[in-house]
Every structure is written in C-alpha cells, then in structure tokens.
Amino acid sequence: MLSYDRILNFVIGARGIGKSYAMKKHPIKRFIKHGEQFIYVRRYKPELKKIGNYFNDIAQEFPNHEFKVKGRQFCIDGKLTGWAIPLSAWQSEKSNAYPMVTTIIFDEFIRERDNSGYIPNEVDALLNLMDTVFRTRENGRCICLSNAVSIINPYFVYFGLVPDINKRFNAYKHILIEIPDSKDFSDERRKTKFGQLIDGTEYGEMSLDNEFVNDSDVFIEKRSKNSKFVFSIVYKGMRMGVWVDTQQMLLYLTTDHDPSTKNVYALTADDLEEGMILVSNYKKNYHIRKLCSAFMNGQLRFDNQLMRTIGYEMFKKMRVQ
C-alpha cells in the first residue's frame, strides 16, 4: 500500500487481520531509522483513555528500545516520537507545528452501526488536520483504518469514491483504497472456538469474511441499454443522472449524466449555479416529482452503493414518504 505513495489512504479489512498492528510498526521503524514522527488519531477524546497501552503488543519486536507513553505523547528511547489526538479537537491543533511528522494514522474511521457518531463536517476536520501537520511538505501521508462495515461512509461520499470491493487496491490520483484479502486468516480463525461461534452470523461476515455488513444490494442495478437520459440532479456538489427505461417502467439514478443537458436541478441553495433550477418542493417540479414517485413505488434503481446512499439521504431531505 505504501508503495503507491498517495497522501490519503484507506485500509478496510477483517477484524484482527493486523491492520492496526502493521500501521503501528511502520512509524516506529521510521522514527528509529530516520527520526520521523507520527500522529495517532481517534474520533473522540474518550477513545484515547487507554492510550497508555499503545506499545504493549509491539514493544517485544524492538527489544533494544524503550517505549513509553506520557499523557498523549509517545516516546522511544526517551525521545518524543508522536502524539495521540482526538479529531473532534482538531481546531485546537491549528496553531501547532509538526515539522517532523510524516504519518497520520486515523483508527476506526468508519462507525460500525450508523452515522450518528461522526463529528460535524468530519472530512473537513481531517483535511484541516492534515493541512496543519503537513503544510507544504510532500512527504506526508494519512492512513485511515477500519473494519469492513460499509463501503459507504462520509469520506467516500465526500470524494465520490466507488471502489471495486473485489480488487485489493483501488488507486486514484491522490487517494488509495486497500481491501486486503483475508481468506487464509479467516480459514485459520474459523478453526477456533470463537470463530465457530460467529461463523454464519452477521458479525462473522464482517470479522471473518471482510464483508460489508451494513451495505445492502436492494435496488442496486446497472441501467439498462434501452434507458434514455432525462435530467440531472446536483446534491452536495455531486451531479447525478436520471435515466428512464419505458419498457421496464424503471428509473435509474447514476453517476453517468449528460453534461450538455439544460435540465439540471439543484436540491439545495449551496448547490445552485447559473443555468440550474432550485427545487425547494419536489411536488411542484414535474421531473423531481416523477423521480420521487418511482422511489416510493419501488421503480427506482441505483447503479452503485454510493448512489443508493446519497439517494436515500436525498429523499429523506425532501421528506419523501
């Protein structure tokens, strides 16, 4: 993953596969060899209560070095090595300087059950922290770690990322998504008593099989060859296309759209640009009313998980029910 040299990296893998351990080991080696420092990030301050145990599982790999945690500072051989920072307090870091930090590790960047635990404007918060730490330096990288909960999260939605979950590496211009293969690890874990206990359960799908248990394939379908483009919608900066297949009586909400169309609807004032039409009440706009009707009648399809998540959020905002 590191060989791709992307500034922002996401690693989503089965629980216990060793994501956190590997990303703990890397900055330790960089500090010992090059004097580079690191920052360990969790979402909220209470999640750092046990940070004093950070080195407990890895210290034995470096028997000639002394590891200590002082408050929220990491030390190796008596020298400051890194910091533990809650993302929720990112604004307090804006005036701090970290000229020797080359690695930011954000652990558990995806919430395991719902979106209620994300901090307001969380992606902007992380980007602000990266900006504060790296400044204009080109040698920094942020690595975000998570269990396989959902391929859809505020970060992928923000950047419009739709990774192929069957590929280990999905490389973009400045971003890399790694979804490690955990088959060998899963086979061994299934032999344990706990592995046998969770095998076949939803928890087992996430922990053993690296399946995205919070994602649903309901209403996800690639648009048909007979579908025709009708109009575009802009929501939270993302432009989406709406297509119709009159033979199947289906509408499709997709990432594909016709950039030359004059039928472009903005659902918020923030998205409104010249040449667009602002829709404040879906019942008063023919196209949007038809889209909402298709959704309510089960006749709307989404071409991927990203479109499904954004679509459901969009309809909720319009109070479609």
UniProtKB/Swiss-Prot annotation:
Segments passing through the bilayer: none
Record GO terms (molecular function): ATP binding; ATP hydrolysis activity
Catalytic activity as recorded in UniProt: ATP + H2O = ADP + phosphate + H(+)
Top EC class, one word: hydrolase
Positions of region (DNA-binding): 222-321
Annotated spans, ATPase: 1-196
Highest taxon in the source lineage: Viruses
SUPFAM superfamilies for this protein: P-loop containing nucleoside triphosphate hydrolases
EC number per UniProt: 3.6.4.-
Keywords: ATP-binding, Hydrolase, Late protein, Nucleotide-binding, Viral genome packaging, Viral release from host cell
Any one Pfam family match given in the protein's UniProt record, by short name: Podovirus_Gp16
Functional description taken from the UniProt entry: ATPase required for the genome encapsidation reaction. Part of the active packaging motor via the binding to the packaging RNA (pRNA), itself fixed to the head-tail connector at the unique portal vertex of the prohead. Binds and supercoils the pre-formed, unit-length DNA bound to gp3 to produce an initiation complex for DNA packaging. Provides the energy to actively pump the viral DNA into the prohead. Approximately one molecule of ATP is used in the packaging of 2 bp of viral DNA.
Sequence similarity: Belongs to the phi29likevirus gp16 family.
Subunit structure and binding partners: Homopentamer. Interacts with the packaging RNA (pRNA). Part of a DNA-gp3-gp16 complex.
Domain-level remarks: The N-terminus contains the ATPase activity and the C-terminus (CTD) binds DNA. The CTD is likely a vestigial nuclease that has lost its hydrolytic capability since Phi-29 is not a concatamer that neads cleavage.
Protein name, entry field: DNA packaging protein
Species: Bacillus phage B103 (Bacteriophage B103)
